[in-house]
Amino acid sequence: MKKNLYPTIAILCLVPFIMVLGNSMLIPVLPKIQEELHVGLVQVGFLITVFSIPAGIVIPFAGMLSDRIGRKKIMFPALLIYGIGGLLAGLFAILFKEKAFPWIIGARIIQGIGAGGTYQLGMALAGDLIQSNERSKVLGLLEAFNGLGKVVSPLAGAAIALISWYMPFFVYGVLAIPIGFLVLWVVSEDVKKLKQQVQPIPKYFGDLAKIFKSKGLALATAFLSGLLALFALFGLLSFFSDVLEKQFKISIFPRGLILGIPVLIMALTAYILGTVMQKQMTRILKWAAVIGLFMLAAGLILFCPFKNLWGLTIAASILGLGTGAVLPSLNTLITSSAPKTERGLVTCLYGTVRFFGVAIGPPLFGLAEKISKPPIFFTTAGICILAGVLFLFLVDPKKIIPKEIQS
């Protein structure tokens, strides 16, 4: 990789880090928010949902537009909107106190709209810049920073919430707005070359249709796998946070430390796998995704019978290990499935299904408190196993990833 790209890659790594704070930093604080705003577990889970659904809706439009005008022109205002939404949520909490819940929901929607133009465009830009087998390493690095954000955010959220439960909302603005300006001033992008490659709208969608016609089953399987990984991870973490508070009476900061264990394992796995895939990409990629999906299922199944803290943490860590194996494999597969002219939209469609997984995970897993764990946990595990089998038979990385990236 060219040395002049190092600052760009460093800034791009900050984008998934800040984006993942959007949900992960709130997870250990949800029980406290529940108490302060007098809402139930399912309701408080909607703080995650109303952030993730707008992000998921915006992502494909942001991707399509970025294919035509450039990635930075979307990422910069998106990061500003993301930060402003967080600042508004904190201000509403101060102004309206125990009646602030609907106002915070509105601010989270604004924040989600901003989030829709961040991480996936960072992935697409990394894919534009790295035209060699180093792409898997760089994408693994981005996913590792995404994972690092998931590790740091429960600890940061728990620590900052010791000041007040609404203080984590202000962190979004303090971090996202400066990072937005770094993207604008530091990140390099060949917009002139991108504009030369811009196609008329009918040809753009025609070429996109050809991609899905030739690789549709494989891409659909990859999209499903990404949705399941994030659905299971965020669903389990939000449920585990509630269990730690109510069943084990663990205070907010130690709770953040415990929740950080599975996501630390996920981040380390993503980074190591991204590095290893450089040497034997097509062989390792497929088996990493399949085994990762089976590990997701194993973590969910094991979480049900365990009653002690160690057992539950081990089960959650197995799920984290599986997520860390699945996501970098999917990132490389999907960013390499389309040429530069359509990469933004294809990558962002993948981001949409990831966000929908995050959106529905916490409220659906929250229902386990009212009914019981096995129906939700075992059903999700079964779908993960099915996705693993589909990936095994329907996805051939050699047919999807260009030869110059494989070698």
Locate the predicted segments by residue.
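Juxtamembrane intracellular "pre-TM" segments in multi-pass secondary transporters
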Residues: 1-2, 188-221
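Central cavity-lining transmembrane alpha-helices of secondary-active solute carriers
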Residues: 49-63, 260-272
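Conserved MFS/SLC helix-loop-helix module at the cytosolic interface between two early adjacent transmembrane helices
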Residues: 57-97
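Helix-to-loop junctions at the C-terminal end of transmembrane segments
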Residues: 59-71, 270-283
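Structural signature of the two symmetry-related core transmembrane helices
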Residues: 74-88, 286-301
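Cytoplasmic helix-loop-helix junction between adjacent transmembrane helices
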Residues: 101, 107-146
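Helix-loop-helix hairpin linking two adjacent transmembrane segments in secondary transporters
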Residues: 141-187
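Extracytoplasmic gate region of multi-pass secondary transporters
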Residues: 218-260
